[in-house]
Regions:
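Catalytic Walker B motif of ABC-type/P-loop ATPase nucleotide-binding domains
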Residues: 148-151
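Conserved ABC ATPase "signature" region
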Residues: 104-119
Length: 230
């Protein structure tokens, strides 16, 4: 992956300003955690980075090309996983079918990676929350994206499911992928991230190495957030 760049990005719904003139450049491979209190704009920022929505003002580019026009491959997993009314195997096959890349061996590899091989032919609707989320991540990975975007991937999941999902994320990064993850789980951000973006009330207040952010947050808002007071 080369560079992601946001330049003076703003987004509003009606009269409500949700993101305000956000600018940053990101070329570091690895895992970037987007942190901030409820309603800060984390999920919205993730959607803009992906390109599924366009900013009202400003530019979002990947390698100098707009997020809507770039050919950079990206996988996106929502907080509530989308489950098709078919088997787990068929859910994983779907992205390959629509891209004309159907490959049973690839599906088997993803079933193994997500620890879902024993459930391959079960209805996806019967999966637990953690299983469904692992399936959603595997489905996002199956077309071999360069970038993976995750919106609260471990929200309300048990520790065992969280551990398996973090293992999937680390494996993707070890293979050269880049991850942007929105999370409320500070412990998870510490475990995974090498870069942190901190936003509050739609404004980007901090960007930098995760170790620096957690050791010496630079703003009053980020200090309050880490104390649990925001």
């Amino acid at each position: 992956m080369s560079g992601l760049k946001l330049t003076n990005v703003s987004y509003s719904v009606g009269e409500k300003h949700l993101l305000h003139e956000i600018s940053f450049g990101q070329e570091t491979k690895g895992i970037t955690a987007i942190l901030g209190p409820n309603g800060a704009g984390k999920s919205l920022l993730l959607s803009l980075i992906h390109g599924v929505i366009k900013p009202d003002m400003g530019l979002v580019t990947w390698n100098g090309v707009s997020a809507q026009k770039t050919k950079l491959s990206r996988g996106y997993v929502f907080q509530t996983p989308i489950v098709l009314r078919r088997s787990v195997r068929a859910n994983l096959a779907y992205p390959l079918q629509i891209t004309g890349k159907h490959c049973p061996a690839t599906i088997d590899d993803m079933l193994k990676l997500s620890h879902l091989t024993p459930l391959a032919d079960h209805p996806a609707a019967s999966l637990s929350g953690g299983e469904a989320q692992r399936m959603a991540i595997a489905r996002a990975l199956i077309t071999k994206p360069e970038v993976l975007l995750l919106d609260e991937p471990c929200s309300n999941l048990d520790p065992a499911s969280t551990k398996l999902i973090e293992e999937m994320i680390r494996n993707f990064v070890a293979d050269g992928g880049s991850v942007f993850i929105s999370t409320h789980d500070l412990a998870q951000a510490k475990r995974l991230a090498n870069v942190v973006l901190f936003i509050e009330s739609g404004r980007l207040l901090e960007q930098g190495p995760a170790d620096d952010f957690f050791a010496a947050p630079a703003t009053q808002a980020s200090r309050a957030y880490l104390r649990g007071d925001l």
